[in-house]
Amino acid sequence: MLHLRSSQMLQMLESSLRKYLPESLKVYGTVFHMNQGNPFKLKALVDKWPDFNTVVVRPREQEMGDDLDQHTNTYQIYSKDPKHCLEFLGTPDVINWKQHLQIQSSQSNLNEAIMDLAAGKMVKVKRTQCILYMMPETAKKLVPSLLEDKEYLDHQSGRPRAIDQEMFKLSTLDVTHAPLVDKFWQFGGNERSQRFIGRCIQIFPSSCLLGPEGTPVSWALMDQTGEIRMAGTVPDYRAQGLISHIIYAQTLAMDKRGYPVYNHTEQTNKVIQKMSHTLHHVPMPCDWNQWYCAPL
């Protein structure tokens, strides 16, 4: 195991991961932001260097003091050879299997290795598998070969429908809005998730629409992997196209900073899939995967 400490190594890792997109997307996005100042204080581990087989990005040990905090204890994994990464992923210094944790990857073929390891270490696993999208400008830059339909090449053509700009004002979230975001997040609902959301709001760009009362009615955030996440709309304002307006605004804000932009949605969420089609988000040939692991 090797911890890539130098900025030169991390830049090399980012360049290398780019060659394996879109399967490396979750790790590529994380390493990209590590090279933008590493605000989440993450570290990148590889099995060998420079010709690595598997890379794991995780928090530093001192950040992982709460064994029950799955939102902090999160690992992003990419492997060129998922069938031969068991030994590396089983190393205690790579993944602390004694904690409640999350593993995220754009590779569904890591499932067998993760399930085998979890069984051997007496860990219960819940897997979430979703549709992965890349925004058109990012896809044009990073994976132009996936843009078979020319409509994706015109970023302006995938606009949301107009909203009442007298009623709704575009703004950014404040850390005091974390409880509201957490209330409507499917992975939220507790103190730890709320703390994670607050951290994301403090560090990364966010977007929201303020309603007539001056409070957020629709919003979207960015997490430490560079993904648009935790988007939501309060029930009274749903079915008005607000979320598509917010996702579009958040995408533009991230595009302007030169960030790669991507997101995911559940396979059963036809409303968001329709929105993604309208905004010309590019569906990836690989999935968004998360494994929630809890020691038995």
UniProtKB/Swiss-Prot annotation:
Catalytic activity: an acyl-CoA + glycine = an N-acylglycine + CoA + H(+)
Domain of life assignment: Eukaryota
Keywords: Acetylation, Acyltransferase, Mitochondrion, Transferase
Protein name: Glycine N-acyltransferase-like protein
Record's subcellular location: Mitochondrion
Major localisation: mitochondrion
One Pfam family, short name: Gly_acyl_tr_N
Protein task: Mitochondrial acyltransferase which transfers the acyl group to the N-terminus of glycine. Can conjugate a multitude of substrates to form a variety of N-acylglycines.
GO CC terms: mitochondrion
N6-succinyllysine found at: K41, K48, K183, K256
Cross-referenced InterPro entries: Acyl_CoA_acyltransferase, Glycine_N-acyltransferase, Glycine_N-acyltransferase_C, Glycine_N-acyltransferase_N
Record's signal peptide: none
PANTHER family: GLYCINE N-ACYLTRANSFERASE-LIKE PROTEIN (PTHR15298:SF11), L-COA N-ACYLTRANSFERASE-RELATED (PTHR15298)
Parts of the chain that traverse the membrane: none
Modified residues (N6-acetyllysine): K41, K43, K48, K80, K83, K183, K256
EC number: 2.3.1.13
GO molecular function: glycine N-acyltransferase activity
Family: Belongs to the glycine N-acyltransferase family.
